[in-house]
Amino acid sequence: MHVIIDYGMGNLASVQRAFEKLQVDVKVSSRKEDLRNATSLILPGVGAFRDAINLLDESGLTSVIKEEVAKGKYIIGICLGMQLLYEKSFEYGEYDGLGLINGSIEYLDVNLKVPHMGWNNLKFTNDNPILKYIKEDEYVYFVHSYYAASDNSEVLAYADYEKMVPAIVRKNNVYGIQFHPEKSGETGLNILKAYKEIIEN
């Protein structure tokens, strides 16, 4: 059983439907025991980093997530969920994240329209099994105003939006997707299909 973490913010139903379409055994839960018993964790999210991390802290889920990931359990963060994986965010102040990936979440300060909303193509930087069913330059759907600023060693794919915007990242058993795979058609499903194979092997 793979658990979609319900902390009060997130596109839970659409993420759940996407995984179920791929016949992944998923459950939405906010119970610590379910997270501990899960095969892997899925961290969705829509909204502000500050609100999300406060809800995770208040519910006691922050420490459980860190403990389970430290044991080697896979986690994938989607959209805001990916941003929560980083050390800190500068959205509406300065807030500590889960600290599972080095780097910080910063405002996407570009001359283009912000939020970065709509379809953009992916460029690959590192090979990884999560990319096995897609080709470079396939389009996925983004909605965000902040992005992950890091040394980019964890970046597997990025979108060019005047800046290099990390789109898929990975550090050991921690994966993150900045765009919405559940809204990205066949390309998004193919990414989740590849991730399914990673967590079920």
Model feature map: region roles:
Residues 2-24, 181-183:
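N-terminal beta1-alpha1 ligand-phosphate binding loop
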Residues 26-37:
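Short acidic low-complexity segments
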Residues 42-44:
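Structural motif
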Residues 47-117:
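Cysteine-nucleophile active-site neighborhood
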Residues 88-163:
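Pocket-forming structural segment of enzyme catalytic cores
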Residues 163-170:
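Short, surface-exposed beta-strand/loop micro-motifs that present aromatic residues
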Residues 177-201:
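Acyltransferase
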